Amino acid sequence: MGHFSEELQQVQTRINRFLEAQFEGIESHNAPLLEAMKYALLLGGKRVRPFLVYATGQMLGAEKQTLDYAAAAIEAIHAYSLIHDDLPAMDDDNLRRGHPTCHIQFDEATAILAGDALQSFAFEILTKTPNISTEQKLALIQILAQGAGVQGMCLGQSLDLISEHKQISLSELELIHRNKTGALLIAALKLGFICSPHFTDKRLEQSLTQYAEAIGLAFQVQDDILDIEGDSAEIGKQVGADLDLDKSTYPKLLGLSGAKQKAQDLYQSALSELEKIPFDTTVRALAEFIITRKS
């Protein structure tokens, strides 16, 4: 995992610099909006979604300069979603990545606007993507919009909110997280895929999608485990928040040991999909990172 950690750190450094550069020349007009956007987008984070964009795209021959734009766009969407998730009307969290959440650092109205603006910012960045065809550029916009909206992340959050204080089945829980967490991870792989010369290969797209579905669920299972076993200082947010909100989680439905086995099963499913892909791939190491991470 040492080699993978180095690659992840390189991605973090590259995407952070690129994201910072996207704000150059934008006037704040003394409003707090721009600072709130920067606060949410640039204040740390694992950058798993950008890593997936780069790893998939480079594996398939995409240019790194092209991938910068797709990676930045999906991270902007992710940052907006975290701002809104943390709001009092949603998950009501005060801590994110070891720092006060956006609505605590600024105020609730500014946080909402910062989330709105980051969503628009993501698509503005995508329209500037160089070295690809108009067809590919439109496909990037479509994939990110679908992954983030009513067929993906927003649907998952809505389902999650209405399931609070209710007993739900494992299949219902998986539906929530296939959308809330998994949809953007699938989008990340597809963005990298679309930026590559192989973007018309439907069989390859299918294997990548199934891999992403498995690691997307595994990511959430591990999140639920860390909400029980994690350390607040290490994971950068409050431990036990799911329990406080009476949310259905994998440990709640399967027990802690059952949840850990579920993560292992999903890891094996992800690896079996990668065996169908005839490329050397860093995304294999990502699957291991997801189920062993401590934050």
From Swiss-Prot:
Lineage runs: Bacteria, Pseudomonadati, Pseudomonadota, Gammaproteobacteria, Pasteurellales
Q: How is the cofactor bound?
A: Binds 2 Mg(2+) ions per subunit.
Of the GO CC terms on this record, one is: cytoplasm
One Pfam family, please name it: polyprenyl_synt
Q: Can you state which reaction this protein catalyses? A: isopentenyl diphosphate + (2E)-geranyl diphosphate = (2E,6E)-farnesyl diphosphate + diphosphate
The scientific name of the source species is: Haemophilus influenzae (strain ATCC 51907 / DSM 11121 / KW20 / Rd)
The cofactor(s) it depends on are:
Mg(2+)
GO molecular function terms attached to this record: (2E,6E)-farnesyl diphosphate synthase activity; metal ion binding; prenyltransferase activity
Where would you say this protein principally sits, based on its record? cytoplasm
**InterPro entries according to UniProt:** Isoprenoid_synthase_dom_sf, Polyprenyl_synt, Polyprenyl_synt_CS, Prenyl_diphosphate_synthase
Q: Where along the chain is Mg(2+) 1 bound? A: 85, 91
Q: Locate the residues binding Mg(2+) 2.
A: 85, 91
Q: Keyword set for this entry?
A: Cytoplasm, Isoprene biosynthesis, Magnesium, Metal-binding, Transferase
Q: What protein name is recorded for this chain?
A: Farnesyl diphosphate synthase
The source's superkingdom equals Bacteria
Q: What gene name is listed for this protein?
A: ispA
E.C. code: 2.5.1.10
Record SUPFAM superfamilies: Terpenoid synthases
Q: Which of this chain's residues are annotated to bind isopentenyl diphosphate?
A: 46, 49, 78, 97
Q: Where in the cell is it found?
A: Cytoplasm
Q: What Gene Ontology biological process does one annotation of this record name?
A: isoprenoid biosynthetic process
Annotated residues that bind (2E)-geranyl diphosphate are located at 96, 180-181, 220, 237
Q: Which family does it belong to?
A: Belongs to the FPP/GGPP synthase family.
Q: Which residues pair up as cystines?
A: none
